[in-house]
Amino acid sequence: MTEFLPFVARHIGPRHEDERAMLAALGLPSMETLITQAVPAPIRLNRALNLPAALSEADALAELGTIMGRNVVKKSFIGAGYHGVHTPPVIQRNLFENPAWYTAYTPYQSEISQGRLELLFHFQTLVAELTGLPVACASLLDEATAVAEAIGVACRHHRDKRSRILLAGELHPQTVDVVNTRAEPLGWEIATGSDVDDNTAAIVVPWPDTRGVYGDFAKVIADAKAKGALVIAVADPLALTIMEAPARWGADMAVGSMQRYGVPMGFGGPHAAYLAVSEALTRIIPGRIVGQSVDAHGRAAYRLALQTREQHIRRDKATSNICTAQALLANMAAAFAIWHGPAGLQAIATRVAALAARFAAALKAAGVEIAGESLFDTVTAKVPGKAAAIAAEADKGGRLIRIIDADTVGVTFDETSTEEDLTALASLFGAKPVGGDTVLVPGKERGEGFLTQEVFHSHRSETEMMRFLRRLADKDLALDRAMIPLGSCTMKLNAAAEMMPVSWNTVANLHPFAPAEQVQGYAKMTSDLEAWLCEITGFAGVSLQPNAGSQGEYAGLMAIRHYHQARGQGHRNICLIPSSAHGTNPASASMAGMSVVVVNCRPDGDIDIDDLKAKAEKHRDNLAAFMITYPSTYGVFEEGIKAFCEIVHDNGGQVYFDGANLNALVGLARPADIGADVCHMNLHKTFCIPHGGGGPGVGPIGVAKHLVPYLPGHVEAGSEHAVAAAQFGSASILVITWMYIRMMGGAGLKKATEAAILNANYIAHRLKGVYPILYTGAHDRVAHECIVDTRVLKDSAGITVEDVAKRLIDYGFHAPTMSWPVAGTLMIEPTESEPKLEIDRLCDAMIAIAGEAKKVADGVWPADDNPLANAPHTASDTLATEWKHPYTREEAVFPGGAFDPTAKYWPPVSRVDNVGGDRNLICSCPPVATYG
């Protein structure tokens, strides 16, 4: 690969000689021949991408450093949901910047995910303890989205018979914006004030409100209880360390952002939000829940619980469309709480509250009117006609305060605030700080202890904390250990050079509402990225706001909805979705107010064009959209894609292109050229943002020219229809994708796509003699992934797809995608980053497993006692004094005999009991007093 600059060769796994060998195995003379066979000619892009020439790692880092150097990092006192933090270096280095943590996938395979599951379990425990509510999910996308999701829970609780939502206090403007976006298609009536009626599903109580004030909500809460409405608290989790838990004053749900638990502002994200609920709401809560169960030998083990709630199973009836959440940031927040412990957290909160109280007292002594009497960290001051002037003076001193209106400013303190800041800020109002540590929260203090669990008291030295995080990471299998061949997930390299800028001061420490002239680096970087993504996809405009692929789907469908409404066709509400679609598609369509009509697929996996045409024509007067994944979820380039788009357009609909499989298209074909009107791009798949063990992700959307006016807006930009709290969503991790594209260039991106297609076809070729490859396209080719039909083992030996998945752990692999999109099969996606050696190792393992299944079929091993049925095998099980199995210990843990003991991955638990875990749901660690 000498014709490319160094990074391209570093990113792509197969060497030239490997490429030649794989092509030879396929009987092909060249890569060009493979692409000609695999990718339909009518969709191919017959020109090079018009992108800047590739740079080396050093040059790209230097260029991005210059760009982000245009940002002016000043100390923020803006607040409004975003706060300065001190990220403990032990957490930054050993968790946030550690590939063992950030390259892991969502922990669906629990046996190889015990480390991050344990820390997410502690996150849930932390949230439950702070809020006083028994059940918490393992993060949502941001605070604004979490409020909207909680409202959705309330409406589902009332079986959609109530639709009125009462905002009982002043929420942050971006939260109201997101709630209003969510409300319109779902028919929610958003009201303000204190009037609770019989149609009120929930009241939303800020704790404190956007002005920093703790209001008196006793009467409206009592009225809500009397009327059967649920109470949702929007609560600051740092304040909750010293303030009364929401459950104590009647909250049924609590939501908020965990950003100030050690996670930088990052110009808006990513940050983990929390949601906690009463026990009665457990089964309708959105997001993933970590539960505690046991393994086959009775050892405690963690797993994702109640998965039947999720969209890949419930589809348009799911509790939410959220798939990727913010697991990495939730783990950071949990680690922050473990590092500081309850006393440390309270010390931080008390100091912040004292600074705010002293500032408030100083202003009052100087005759300045402030809002409210009960405060935590924020003081809102009335300064008639002087807001801009005071903010400008603060800016000159290197501090940013919030301009609420021409007559009002807000000042928010955080853990980075100092005595010097207090004095300087007070002087802007002609005031001097007064002494004392009085906190203005009379009668609202936390009266009970919290976080008594041992884990929050055991890691005070850095040595202990470092080893704790290492022990957790060692339990897991991430990309730093082995290939993760998950179909439809694109687990490719997250290069160090791409990741490094995320920690830069000029990237991490800007408030999303900082003045525009101080964030010119972000403006340039995001402008570059939007232009590059437009060129890659062929679209006219891009929004970077959606902070997950599911949010991208929602944003794209909402753009279609608003387009139809603007043309006087708001009645268009039918969304055609193939039966093969990912579950987020119908879930997102439902959230966008659309009714789902399923389009059948043919036995060969392709969409049934006759069924599509019939249903499009049947619903032509009300057709809103058609959602299609391409290549298909079956891993095939369907020849009829352009015809599908024409049918939909001819019947008045718009084509939504799910970009989950964009890794098979970049540089070879463009969604807009194919006929799509809108497409979301998973930057955490195709464009190298890591999965983080279940988030963060970024799901920007590209749209055709006629849809550009309907891209998500933001209240800070003077526009509407935001789908996320910050204008650029998870802005700080956009630099990862910027670096990837800048170092690859157009030719490198195309080469990566070709390598991904080659790797998948090579795997299909090697395995097809042992397992049927379920779907192929023209010339018997697949796209970038293939479905391996392991049901042949079930038929011959009773070996299930789960047995195969768990046995792969003994071979040192994360299993491919299991039982999706076809039950009983495995879908394999190698990506371009895996070298031939690792690909061959996976193929060898799959072939060896088929050989093991044959021994079961032949009666050599019993059906109920064999290495597959008992997989995975732990070290403790293997070292047990008694070994009663009909296979040897070596066959159990070093299958095939050729596996290097020095590279052995040992799962910490054997197969986890999923059914028992759901029947006996435990999703937080009980307080120590419980054991008394």
Curated annotation (Swiss-Prot):
Keyword Plastid: no
Pfam families: GcvP2_C, GDC-P
GO biological process, one term: glycine decarboxylation via glycine cleavage system
EC number: 1.4.4.2
GO molecular function: glycine binding; glycine dehydrogenase (decarboxylating) activity; pyridoxal phosphate binding
Keywords: Oxidoreductase, Pyridoxal phosphate
The protein's required cofactors: pyridoxal 5'-phosphate
Domain of life: Bacteria
Post-translational modification N6-(pyridoxal phosphate)lysine, affected residues: 685
Membership in a protein family: Belongs to the GcvP family.
Role of this protein: The glycine cleavage system catalyzes the degradation of glycine. The P protein binds the alpha-amino group of glycine through its pyridoxal phosphate cofactor; CO(2) is released and the remaining methylamine moiety is then transferred to the lipoamide cofactor of the H protein.
The protein's name in its UniProt record: Glycine dehydrogenase (decarboxylating)
Gene: gcvP
